[in-house]
């Protein structure tokens, strides 16, 4: 599990909640830090903020999807960007779930757990369901 957010408070909030649920959690401060760490950590799931310095979440998610070594890692965008265009862009990139801040830690845990188990995420969560790539 890799938690990527430039806001230390949010990064630690996510990391602590996931650690308490039994996840082995590493953190990164931005997209570049994520890419630098991802191969060594080999996470099943990455939570990723969008608005970050150096390398934003959009580009980070795109680069993860394009790289054969990281293309199957589940990506959950957790962001303050709640516009429909942002959610659509997430689907186009191929993120697995999209949660908006402020988020419910319980819902975030359910989504991450479902993705880590490679099961579909909770369909009752509007943002999560909207964040999935459309099936062809």
Regions flagged by a language model, labelled:
Residues 12-20:
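Charged docking surfaces used in two-component/phosphorelay signaling
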Residues 22-29, 37:
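Short hydrophobic/Thr-rich beta-strand motif most characteristic of the beta2 strand and flanking loop
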Residues 41-47:
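Active-site beta3 strand of CheY-like receiver
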Residues 52:
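Receiver (REC) domain active-site loop signature in two-component systems and cognate sites
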Residues 103-113:
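C-terminal output helix
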